[in-house]
Design a protein with these regions (language model features):
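A transmembrane-helix-recognition feature enriched in membrane-embedded lipid enzymes
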Residues: 1-63, 117-118
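Soluble catalytic domains of membrane acyltransferases
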Residues: 57, 61-164
């Protein structure tokens, strides 16, 4: 029975997920261009709240432990194992107080509504994994942003989703 339900629920989830991305893309643009970084950050937080809630369609729930141990107003490096799309939305939503910025592959900077815009304008580093010379200035730029503003940077060191 679960398997029978999983296919239509997966389609519904993917559809709703993509609709949220489409809805929030112009919202992010307006927030960033008319009201600045803080408004953009708030729009990204609400987008990710919607995406986290969308996961409930699949029966997914989140239990985050130890949030009281995450220091605020200090630069942080968050290193995680990349399991699924859920990683990113939960990190952005549940760690929004530490302003997570991502070190991401350059391909994600184009063509994905909301995601690409946020990566390009939200302070993340877009890395061309085939060009180390391009990566260094990007990493330096995000490191300075994180250090100067007490934000956090998130990196998935495996560089892609892990099977383990």
């Amino acid at each position: 029975m679960e398997k029978i339900l999983s296919y239509p629920l997966s389609i519904l989830y993917t559809l709703v997920f993509f609709i949220w991305l489409l809805i929030f893309h112009p919202i992010q643009w307006v927030c960033f261009n008319l009201f600045g970084y803080n408004a953009h950050r708030l729009s990204v937080a609400y987008l990710n709240l919607c995406l986290v809630r969308t996961a409930h369609l699949l029966g997914t729930t989140y239990h985050i432990k130890g949030m009281e141990n995450v220091p605020e107003n200090k630069p942080l490096i968050i290193v995680a194992n990349h399991q699924s799309l859920h990683d990113i939305t939960t990190i952005i939503w549940f760690l929004r107080k530490v302003h997570p910025k991502f070190i991401s592959k350059i391909e994600l900077g184009k063509g994905i509504p909301s995601v690409s815009y946020n990566l390009r304008h939200g302070g993340s580093a877009l890395i061309d994994r085939k060009d180390p010379k391009q990566a260094l200035p990007e990493i330096k730029k995000v490191a300075e942003l994180v250090n100067n503003n007490n934000y956090s940077v998130v990196i998935f060191p495996e560089g892609t989703r892990s099977k383990t």
